[in-house]
Structures are given as C-alpha cells and as structure tokens.
Amino acid sequence: MTSAASNTEMIIGITPFGEPDARLASAVSRAGGLGVLDLGTGDQNAREALAHMRHLAPRPFGVRVGARCRLSPEEIVAGKTGMEGGAEPHAVILGIGSPWQVGDVAAHFKVLVEVADLEQALEAVRAGAYGLVARGSESGGRVGELSSFALLQHLRLDIPVWVCGGIGPRTAAASMVGGACGVVVDSQLALLAESELDEAVAAELRSMDGSDTVLMAGHRVLHRRGPSAPLVPADDPETVAAMLGARDLSTQLLPVGQDGFLAARFAERWGDVGRTVRALTDAVRDAVRDDVAAQALRDGSAMSRAFGIRLPVAQGPMTQVSDQAGFADAVAADGALPFVALALANGAQTRAMLVETHATMSGRPWGVGMLGSAPEDIQSAQLDVVRELKPTHAIVASGRPSQAQALEQAGIRTFLHASSPVLLREFLEAGACRFVFKGSECGGPVGPWSGFPLWEAQLAVLEDFLSHAGEDSAQRLEVLLAGGVHNERSAAMVATIAAPLTARGVAVGVLMGTAYLFTEEAVENGAIQPLFQRQVRAARRTVLIRTAAGHVARCIPSPFSRDYVEQEAELKVETMPECRIRTELERLHVERLRIASKGEGRDSTGALSQVGEERQLTEGLFVAGEVAVLRSATTTISALHHSVTEGAADFLTRRADLLRERLRVGADEEPIAASVLRR
C-alpha cells in the first residue's frame, strides 16, 4: 500500500450515522482535515446540506454516497444542487453497496471506495478508484468480517488506504505506521460542539461503553432493548439497511460502531472539531518523533526483563494445542515465554502436563493458562498442582483479582484478561497490575471488542490511572496486547499504540496464538496434526460460534461449526441451566478440539483412540483467529519471533522516517499529543 496523499487528506471526518451535517463537515475542513458530508438517502435535507456545504467550506471537502442515496452523479457536479456557484467536492466516497460506480464520477473527483474485504478492494482498484477506505467490522453500518487492524494488514495493495473503525489518537498513529495514508472518524465526532445531532441520540451515545453494539444482517447497530426499541420485522440486509438512521430511535436502528464510546471522550477532552483534528494529527507526529515504540520490541526491553527472558513475546495458551512440553521447549529456546493451557483438565491430567513441562524447562521461565470460569472442583485441583510445581507465570482468562492474588502469593506472576474499561478499573482498584488486552481478532473465546477500540479504551484507562496513582506506579504495570499480531507490520502497529505507556515505564509485550499454528515446530512437537495446519493455511475466513449466553468463540469454518447450532439446541431442549449448558459446550469444544489438533477421539466405549483425517475434518473444531486469513505459508518459531521483534522494530523505524518527512516532523520538536492524552 502507498501513502501518496496530501496531509489535508490524512484525517477524514464523515458526518455520523448517514446524516448530512454541513456545519460539522465544514468544521473538519477548516481544521485541516477533509470534511465529508454523508448524503444519506439523498432527500431534500441532503440537497440543502450539500448546497450549504458548497458555499460554507473554505477548504476541500467531500461527499459520501451510501447504498440508499437517491441522488444521481450529475447532481453532485457544481450548479446541479439547486444553488448556483460555490465549491465542488474534492472527493467522493462510495459506501459499500453504493448505486454509483467509480467510472460515474472519476473524471470529476477523487473517488475513494469503502471496502470490507480483499475481494471488494481488488474490484475497486480494477475500476480505477483513487483510494480505499478499509471499513473494519467494528465500524457502524454495513461491515464485513475483518476488524480494522486485520483488514489494513490484508490490503497490501499499491493504492492509498484510509482506516475506518476504532480510530482514536493511538490507533490513528498505529494505522499510519502500518501503512495507511490516513484515517477516518465519524461517530467519534457526534458529540462535538459543531454537531447538530438530535439530543435523544446524543444521550444514547454518552452512555455507550463500546460493548453495546450488535451485528444485524451484516450491519453494526446500537443494541437497544425495551419498549422504545424499534421492531425489526426481518433479519435480512435490505430490511435492516432501510431502518438505519439517527432521526427517530423508536423506528430506526442507529448505525454506530464499537468506537461510539469515543464520542463522549472526544467531546470531554477536546470539545470541538478543531482541537480534535489537531489532537489526532499531533498523535501521529509524536508517534514517529522518536524510537520509544521500536525499543519496546527489541531484545532486553522492559517486558523482556519482567519476563526474565530475551524477547517481549508470550505464546498464548491454546486449549488442546499448547499442552506439549516439547512445544513449550521450542518456544522458550528461541527467547519467548510459553504457556501451557490447562483448560478443563482434571488434577491427574494437569499433573501429567506440568510435571513433564517443569522437567523440560529446567528452570527457564514458563507459564500456565487457566480458566477463571472453570468449575470450582477443576480449579481447585489445578491450583493444587500449579502451586506445587510453581511455573513462573500464569494467565487467567475470565478471572478475578482474588484468583490472581492467590497465585501471586505462591510466587507466580499472574496476568488477568481485562475485557472492558469497567473491569480494568475494578482490577486496578483491587491491586492487580498484569493484564492481557485481547481483541476479538483472536481465536477461541473472544470478547465484544475488536483490538483497535479495546486498546484505545484500555490504554486510556491506564494513562488516567497513572496520572492519579503517580508515575512510580508505571514500573509495576505489565501489559500484553493480543489479537491479530503475527508479523512486522502488526507488531509495529501494536507497539505504536502502546508507546505512550512505554515512554512512562510500563512493560509492554505481545501475546500470540494463531501465528504459532503456522510454525513447523507446532507439528514437529505434536501440538497440532498436519491436517490442522493445512486447514489454517487454507483458511479464507473465520466464523464465530456461540458457546453460552454472551459468549462466542472464533474458529475456521468446518462441518462441525456449521452443525454447531443444532448441537447447542439439543442441550437447550434438555432445559439445563445456562451455566450447565456453558460447561457442557466447553466440554464439547475440548473434545472436538482434541479431534482437530491431536487426531484423537472417543470410541463407543468412551476411550480415546487415534482417528483418521476424514473424521478429523468432519468432527474437528479448528480454532484460529483472523491471522489465519492473513497468512498462508508455514514458518519457524525463530523466524516468527524475529518478525515481531527486531523485524517489527526495523519496520517501524523505516515507516517513521517516511512519515517524519511527509509530516515535516523534527526530532527536536517538543511532543504535543502526549500531554493532551493525559488531560
């Protein structure tokens, strides 16, 4: 991808929710960004807003033409909107499903095309688009399957790309480092002073926390409940698209993304469009001013020292995969921290795994992955063995501070998954200091947030915490970012996001799972069978399957994943309590994971035995994250580790050099955005 675009185009601000707002769009242009008027349905309100915009905007502006716009291309040309004179749009953004074609307007304007996958991107390039808007799955309205973080990595094309979805100051900088030529904000602008948003909608936005959206027929919308929520007659794309809007929430679906919570934060911190555009621009400039982010990736970084190893890299616990001592040894031998997944193993199974791993590791750091939600008897049995054999580290998924404290008291440094800002604040107040921030790009159980909005939210919480607790507290904090990390580009982006924390002394590293499935050592050491690796390499998409109320897991499409709904329904017919259904489904997952990863299944007597590849393919659950869509070739652990550390640091340095030249950043300039972020 290329960054060949003007600095004016680095920050694109689209009027939110498919509503034309000339005042807001023109404010973006005046602030030095590219203000874009969403023409919505193309009704009289849109026509008047466009006419007003043409006379109001002193700087270049654009229009967005979504799937429901009734205006024709001819009406956008100057003089065709009912008011003679005024400026022409600088650019036209065609939304997914737009009735306009690139060729309809390419002779008059720069045409940017919104895309949600690689196929749409290639089609836009063939049609002659000037650039692409990578609309991640966390965005509001029509979306695809890949998050912004994953989609940007997937679009390795020689054409300018703007990232839309989950954009705040940290992720804006990361997107630019990752190769984007700019970023797009929309719902983030909704509560700023210039916005003319209806107060009822504004009130809904102020209460958002990022986990209150839902995918409905390929559209992300606000999940509203109660008698005032609109009734959706059919869960199909046309019906849902026709109900999108922000004028009457009793009859319309608000097309807001996971980043909707940022609207309140932007309004609180910056207040108006001018300060917001400057803050985003300054965050990018500050990110490339020095090598703080790159240093976090190199040998001997703060996280490396905290781990007691060479690299700031952890291999995430993977049920029925990272349960082999030989695989843990291979990970540790190349300088990373391996984690053995205990999942639902009983006491005897836990002992067998950990005794072998303990002996193999010979005093080197290693860890265990535990489920904080596992049945109490299983947790108790596992804890007895863990306390006895004392791995150096632990990760507790769905855990609580009390569980972490019990392990810490045994001398085991313990990380908690913190899946929301609310939980993170609770954990910090309880004294926890080691966290995993896992975006929904991961394989297996995932939370409601994709990486970009989650990391933007969680790092802001930590920065606020440090501002009140004092800078000395930074030395206690250790943070692992997970989800979609697998190569130079992705690790460089993650390091850029975390750079403000790194600069304050927080230890930051990356945690990977799916990337290890592509390594030769995963097969050689029995972590997975060759078929599992072939399935991962061939994956073109991932799917989410429901594991319990409010819980989903990411995997590769397979016969089992397609039939899963029926098996879940069978458990519900038995009228089990929800907690029992969740436990039974987790056991089912473990059994099917074993078939997929180890080629072992139970026979008619219940005993484990080897199964052939046909049964493995038919009955297996192939858990993997969105990285499976981004990779196709095998690698080695050594090459993987190099790519996300030294390779990523070098990548970041090269990108920073290019961006400093483009943005005319001097290394001796005083940073601006860091102080703004801490306000």
What are these model-derived regions, one by one?
Residues 1-159, 170, 244-474, 639, ...:
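Active-site entrance/lid segments in N-terminal catalytic domains of soluble metabolic enzymes
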Residues 25, 126, 139, 145-160, ...:
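Conserved active-site-proximal phosphate/metal-binding subdomains
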Residues 374, 484-485:
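Short, internal active-site loops enriched in acidic
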Residues 481:
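Short pre-catalytic strand/loop immediately N-terminal to key active-site residues, enriched for Gly-Thr
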